[in-house]
């Protein structure tokens, strides 16, 4: 399967330099940037997440979609950075505004509201309850089979989509891949759940995800660096992505949710060698 993809360039503002001690001397070294992003809906502050700057609009859209606050881009009029140059926090506030004639349900916003800032490592911290999340997951249909070769191709694309990691060693990455093996969206972030929100948000804007997606085939695979936790499976299921591939292990709750949601969950992927923890029949396998 063809997996050629030009290596992506690092987004502006994603890399900083700091002085470090190395081999008895002081040198300048590249480090990944981590800054807060406040997400608002129609001016109402909803959440603050620690993220790496870049694709902030996609991050906000993907976050709201995964939370069930928006059903699709049809709900959204504009997504803008707030403030003026020189103001404290300029560029670190995104305001998602409702489309004309439509208002996002405030009660739905309150149901998804987080009581504490969202760290880069936690995609579900502060939510009212895990049970509330489970109630919003609808099992995916079996659909068409997916070739194991697509999983391997997705991981190759993932490896080519990490320019900031190559410079800093400090970021996670996610990529959405179509059934034809072509990349739909890729992103890096200090938080793995943020990287997933970014690619889902990009796919939403491109018309590839959502209830009215019609711009092209839906994503068939989400490939992620690091482990596959509960929040990764939840976000993939919300976006209708049938297969998740991770370079590392899933958690027990991720496996349980994947089985309940009809998502094929693959871990420790090395080429076409992998552990399949849930719904292996989609890959032509028998078992979990």
From Swiss-Prot:
Disulfide bonds: none annotated. The keyword Transmembrane does not apply. One of its GO terms (biological process) is Mo-molybdopterin cofactor biosynthetic process. It comes from the Bacteria. Gene3D superfamilies: 3.10.20.10, Cytidine Deaminase, domain 2. Keywords: Cytoplasm, Molybdenum cofactor biosynthesis. Required for formate dehydrogenase (FDH) activity. Acts as a sulfur carrier protein that transfers sulfur from IscS to the molybdenum cofactor prior to its insertion into FDH. Belongs to the FdhD family. This is Sulfur carrier protein FdhD. It comes from Anaeromyxobacter dehalogenans (strain 2CP-1 / ATCC BAA-258).
């Amino acid at each position: 399967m063809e997996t050629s993809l030009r290596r992506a360039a690092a987004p502006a503002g994603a890399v900083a330099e700091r002085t470090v001690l190395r081999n008895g001397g002081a040198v300048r070294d590249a480090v990944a940037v981590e800054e807060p992003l406040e997400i608002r809906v129609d001016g109402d502050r909803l959440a603050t997440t620690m993220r790496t700057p870049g694709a902030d609009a996609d991050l906000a859209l993907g976050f709201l979609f995964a939370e069930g606050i928006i059903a699709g881009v049809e709900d959204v009029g504009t997504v803008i950075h707030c403030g003026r140059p020189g103001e404290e926090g300029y560029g670190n506030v995104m305001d998602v505004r409702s489309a004309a004639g439509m208002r996002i349900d405030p009660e739905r916003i309150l149901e998804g509201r987080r009581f504490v800032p969202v760290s880069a490592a936690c995609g579900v911290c502060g939510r009212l309850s895990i049970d509330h999340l489970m109630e919003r997951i609808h099992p995916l249909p079996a659909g068409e089979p997916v070739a194991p070769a697509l999983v391997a191709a997705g991981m190759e694309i993932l490896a080519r989509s990490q320019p900031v990691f190559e410079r800093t060693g400090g970021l996670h990455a996610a990529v959405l891949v179509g059934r034809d093996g072509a990349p739909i969206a890729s992103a890096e972030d200090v938080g793995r759940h943020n990287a997933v929100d970014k690619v889902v948000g990009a796919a939403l804007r491109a018309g590839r995800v959502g209830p009215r997606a019609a711009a092209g085939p839906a994503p068939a695979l989400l490939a992620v660096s690091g482990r596959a936790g509960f929040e990764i499976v939840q976000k993939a299921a919300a976006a209708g992505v049938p297969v998740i591939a991770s370079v590392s292990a899933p958690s027990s709750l991720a496996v349980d949710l994947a089985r309940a949601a009809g998502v094929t969950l693959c871990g420790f992927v090395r080429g076409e060698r992998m552990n399949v923890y849930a719904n292996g029949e989609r890959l032509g396998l028998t078992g979990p």
